[in-house]
Each structure stands twice: as C-alpha cells, then as structure tokens.
Curated annotation (Swiss-Prot):
It is a peripheral membrane protein. Belongs to the GPAT/DAPAT family. GO terms for molecular function: glycerol-3-phosphate O-acyltransferase activity. It catalyses: sn-glycerol 3-phosphate + an acyl-CoA = a 1-acyl-sn-glycero-3-phosphate + CoA. Keywords: Acyltransferase, Cell inner membrane, Cell membrane, Lipid biosynthesis, Lipid metabolism, Membrane, Phospholipid biosynthesis, Phospholipid metabolism, Transferase. GO terms for biological process: CDP-diacylglycerol biosynthetic process; fatty acid metabolic process. A motif (HXXXXD motif) lies at residues 305-310. Its main location: membrane. InterPro entries: GPAT/DHAPAT, GPAT/DHAPAT_C, GPAT/DHAPAT_LPLAT, GPAT_PlsB, Plipid/glycerol_acylTrfase. This is Glycerol-3-phosphate acyltransferase. The gene is plsB. It comes from Klebsiella pneumoniae subsp. pneumoniae (strain ATCC 700721 / MGH 78578). The HXXXXD motif is essential for acyltransferase activity and may constitute the binding site for the phosphate moiety of the glycerol-3-phosphate. One of its GO terms (cellular component) is plasma membrane. The keyword Lipid biosynthesis applies.
Amino acid sequence: MSGWQRIYYKLLNLPLQVLVKSKSIPAEPAQELGLDTSRPVMYVLPYNSKADLLTLRAQCLAHDLPDPLEPLEIDGALLPRYVFIHGGPRVFTYYTPKEESIKLFHDYLDLHRNHPDLDVQMVPVSVMFGRSPGREKGEVNPPLRMLNGIQKFFAVSWLGRDSFVRFSPSVSLRRMADEHGTDKIIAQKLARVARMHFARQRLAAVGPRLPARQDLFNKLLASKAIARAVEDEARSKKISHEKAQQNAIALMEEIAANFSYEMIRLTDRILGFTWNRLYQGINVHNAERVRQLAHDGHEIVYVPCHRSHMDYLLLSYVLYHQGLVPPHIAAGINLNFWPAGPIFRRLGAFFIRRTFKGNKLYSTVFREYLGELFSRGYSVEYFVEGGRSRTGRLLDPKTGTLSMTIQAMLRGGTRPITLVPIYIGYEHVMEVGTYAKELRGATKEKESLPQMVRGLSKLRNLGQGYVNFGEPLPLMTYLNQHVPDWREAIDPIEAVRPSWLTPTVNSIAADLMVRINNAGAANAMNLCCTALLASRQRSLTREQLTQQLECYLALLRNVPYSPDATAPSASASELIDHALQMNKFEVEKDTIGDIIILPREQAVLMTYYRNNIAHMLVMPSLLAALVTQHRHLSRAEVLRHVETLYPFLKAELFLRWEKAELAGVVDALIAEMLRQELIVVDGDVMSLNPSHSRSLQLLAAGARETLQRYAITFWLLSANPAINRSSLEKESRTVAQRLSVLHGINAPEFFDKAVFSTLVLTLRDEGYISDTGDAEPEETLKVYRMLADLITSDVRLTIESVTQDDA
C-alpha cells in the first residue's frame, strides 16, 4: 500500500472511529469458524465501500485476524486481500469496475493451479449499518443494498452504532481449484454464488419487508376461512354482517403485532445499558445453528422454556446481537396493559388468550394471522409450556399453538418450518418470590403498571444469564418419517385436523421438551443451591461445599448430560466466590474456617434454581442413593433398579435416554464415580467408599424427594388397588403435604399437582394400572419395597402410617 493510500485511509478512518461501534458475529470469528491464521486469508465483501472495508479492518485487528489492507504476497505476486463482488454505485457513474471481482477470483484460482501447496481461505464478510426491512408499499428492498458515497455517509452517521460485521465460514480455494478447475467460468460462478450468499445473509439479518397494518387486516378479512367465520358469527349471534366483521377487526387489533425497527433500535440501546448493569454476562451457546438455518431459508420457530417475563426481552436481544431478525412473539394477553402492551407490540409481540374454547371467530382469526406470519417468512417465538414455570422445572407442554403451526404447514406454500428449542437459565429470577407465594396458595397478582414498577425497582445484581440453543427439529423431516402421507391432508383454505394430528403434536411437544433440557446450563447458583439443599441443615463448610461442587463439575464435564448441555469452566472455588456475591447465602466465620448457610427463608426460593438442573444430575443421584442405602450392589441389581424407576423419571423430568441406552449411561457414571473414589468396585459389585461417604450422600440427596414421592403413590396403590386415578392423585398430594411438614421438606414441587398427575399417567402407560382402573397389586408392592429400601426409615413409617391411621 502506497504512502498516499495510507494517508487516505487514516483520514477516512478518523470519523469512523467516532461514528462506528460495530459488533463481530460470531464474537470470536477465528475460534468459532476454525480459521487458520497461519494460512493465507482473503476477505470477500458484497459491494465496494471503503467505510465497510475500514469497519472490517477494525474488527480484524481486534480479533488478531490478518489486516485486509495488507496485500497477500504469493510467489512474488501482490494481490489485494479483499474482493468486492459489486463495484457499487457512485455519485458520478463514469467508472464502474464490473469485472474486477471476477478477475481477482481468477487470479487467485490461477495461483492455486501453479502452486499445489497453496490454500487460501476465502472468508465472506458482510458489514451492515442498520437493519430496517422497510415497508411493502413504495419501497424496494434489493438483495444487496448498494449505497453511493453520500448515502453511505448518512447511513454511517445515523446507524454507525447499530452495525455489525458478519464473518461466514471460510471456503478453501484449494478445494475449489481441485474440484472445479481454475478457468474464468469458475471465477464467474464463484462471484455468482457469493452474491447469492450475501443476499440470503441480508434476508436473515433484516427479514422480509413489513406490511402496512391495515393492508394486513384487509388481506386477512379477504381470506375464505375468516369470511366464513364472520358469516357464522353473524348467524349465531344474530347480528349484522358488518357488526360481525367489526368484531373480527377488533380481534385482529387485539392480536396483531405492530413491528417497529426504530423501537427495536431504541430498546436495544436501553437493554444494552441495562444488561451491563444488572447482568455480569449473557452466555450464548450454539447460535451458529440458528444463523445457518436462517441463511438456508428456513422458517424458524423459536421454542424456549419459560422462566420469567424477562425471557421475551432477553431472547430478542440475543438474536438481534447474533445478526438475526427478532421474532414475532406470542405473548399472554395478561401483558397487554399500558404501557407494556404497546411497547411489546412494537417489539414484535402478538397477544394470545389463555383459551380459545367457545370462540370460533377468535380461533380462526388467530390461526389465520399465525399462518400469514409463516407465509410472509417472519420468524416466530412461543412458549410451549404455556406459562412461566413456578418450580424451576419444565411444565407439561400446551400444544395449541404448536398444533396451529403444523396446520399452517397443511395449508401448503410455506417455507420449511424448523422448531428451535432454547434453554434459558438465570442466576436470579426476579419473580421467584412471587412463584413461592403462588405455590403456597396465594392468588396470582394481575400484571399491571404498578406491579411492573415494583418489580423493576427491585432489580439488582442478576448474575449471569444463559441462552443455549438446542438441536433444531425440522417439521417436514419429522412428518416425513412419522406420517409419510401427511401431504394428503393439505388444504389451502380450511384448517384441517387429520386423525394423526393430535398424537403427532403430542409427540413433537414431548420431543421439544427433551431437547430444551438437553441444552441445560449448570451455573454457580444452581450448583451451590443443589449442594446446600442436599445437606440436612442447609449448611456446609467452605471446604465441604468446594468438594461437592468439584464432584458435580467432574460428573457434568466427564459424563455430560448431552452434547448441548453446558457446565461452567471456572473452578469450584471461583463458583462459590461468585455465588456469594449474589447475596443469597450467609457466611459464618470461626477459628476453623467459613460455614456457608442457606437461610431458612431463602431455602424454598432456592429450590427453584436447584430444579433448573435436576434433570442433569438425577441419574448420578439415583446411583448414589442405591449405593448409600444398600452399601453393596451388583451391576445387574443397579440396572434392574434403574430400569424400573427410569420411566417415571423420564416422564417427570423429560430425560433424554431410551431404555436401551440405560446400560451404557449407568456404566459411564459408575466409571466416573469410581474415578472420583466415591465408590469401590470389586469385580461386579460396587460398594460405598467410607472416606468419601459425605460427597456420595450429598449426591444421593438429589433424588431423595423424588423417590419419597414415588414411594407415597406406590404405597397407596398397593394398599388400595381399586383406587381411582383422581383419588390416587389427591391422596398422594395430601400425604406429600403431611410428609413435608413432619420431615421439613421445603420443596414446593414436592406436592405439586402436576407432578403427581404425570406420575399417575405414567403408572397407566407402564401397565401398573389397567384400563379398568385397577392396579396390579403384586407389581406395585414389589416397586414399593424397592423404593422403601431407598428412603429413610422415619419417612417410610410416616408413609405407611397413613393407611393404618385411616383403618
């Protein structure tokens, strides 16, 4: 680069340093994209822009990537390290280098022909200033928005702080040369493929153009399904057609989002400021999956777990900062209060009632609106649990919106729909105190402005946040595998309900819950809470707590729950220091050392965080319980216990393994527990290691309350085989409440109605209860005896005294 060019770029860079604050996607491009900086790297940009080039340069230097302004020297030849696909418009159009990119591609390919050891990594990069999709009427939205110098100046001035540099996976020019040749035609194809790549990338980042709201309503009103529903409304309520149509429009006003890019920008600024003060970090994993789906043209439906009202904002914020379009979000109608409702609506929220029953017009309007979102190509987000979890565990899925998603596919004409499960985790949930009150019987407080202000005023240090993207579920692939003739049900007008729809939706919903849990995130708070709640007095010395966290961490790292699950990289001591900063625990100091205490009033609240990762530790906890209670146990006996109890654990906690996989899981966990010296193995028999009995007992406590719950139900069933399912659920809850009082069990989910409902359903599915409702007394008594050996004698006596008291 000549001296004059250096001066030119330095002068041009001065205003950019002030105006532009760009973000790199991914955050660590070399690491996440597997770039080898020891090999030559060249950058491909969509169009000629020095502002884009200098913005790219700033990110390259910040991430130790080669400087795009430094040319590549190959065998004495100097070649630019960057290529512009389009020359781009200028204020004066007398010069447009149309063939420049093709010539450079050809030069690079030609060098590979002459140098067999050469392998240049070609990295496509898009630099975007602003992401407004524009409106449908009167605007054009080309695949590559090329701006002349003056337009670019205003874009950078206004949108420089809302810019990002998106690095794509590199392409090996060696592979291109070897597989396709090096002539000019290949260079032209390479340029054409690059143009298509950037067009798709822009659509993924910006999304389709937005319709005028009234135009959208007019289109919905003109649909045959809503027109028929309006006629039915007029006839059934004996009102005029105009009045029925007004009712339909009112429902559209109630439901529909009013997406605003300017509101997204403003909220991003506010949230960025807020997150930096409330959170110590937002940890995002596997986002590249979603970026690839968006790039490949999939219709994405985000399906996160629901912990908090914060979920709406956090996920949209994360997606926006991953270079993706924030989705249209299905929000409960309870959030449609001033001023939150109008704000959420402009951020993409569309509102949904708790029930559709008895209102055909509403269900038709909602279904048609959802179908229109899909047909226009907008990403959508909804919470398949239906509401926020009050216990920290996943709730049983509500399948209404999921069913409508599949019905939208049965209309035909939509892009391939892919469901993306998402695990959201927090070290502090602002509503957790309210959840505990509601579980104790308090009436749910209606969402309102005063409640929102009170909640916001209490926000302090929220620790870390976690957003883990799970394994995507492509709907078309799933239907092709499980319902091969599903296309026969396609009807472009009517919402069809083929016989296979309900069982298929239920199966997909259960699969999604498993995939959400597969992406679980262990953190300092839920690990410390798990250990402290496992101790009888909710307190451990710092040394004991450190040892127990080391045990959990080794299990999670060496025998990971799933490939998508994450465990902290920090040491146990560092995690404890971090957890203490959250001000949830008390520390008593004496001459020997620190004692870390979970105060009684905090214990119930902290079960929420323990439950977030209960599924990740329940299997090692069950094995630990077997060893601590039996002292000596053969592998075959362990496997028999596990195979008997696993169906109930799987249904309750949405565990991932099938029965055939259990032997391998058990062997891997036994090997890890042996490595940690928690157990001793002699031939085929495993025994407790007395020198590590405390760690094993604390690990076993993770399954203690679950096993007690199962023991209650199996005892009631064996004592009264003719008991009906409803009575079994009710009596099980009553005994569980009694047990919690007598034995100091502070977990609200211990007597949760939904937990016992799932347990009783699984009893039927596993054949312990016949279709007529009677139990199999021999089988139920056999399982009860197995469970009775795994719980303490005082708890067992309390359970067995119930029927004796009744007698």
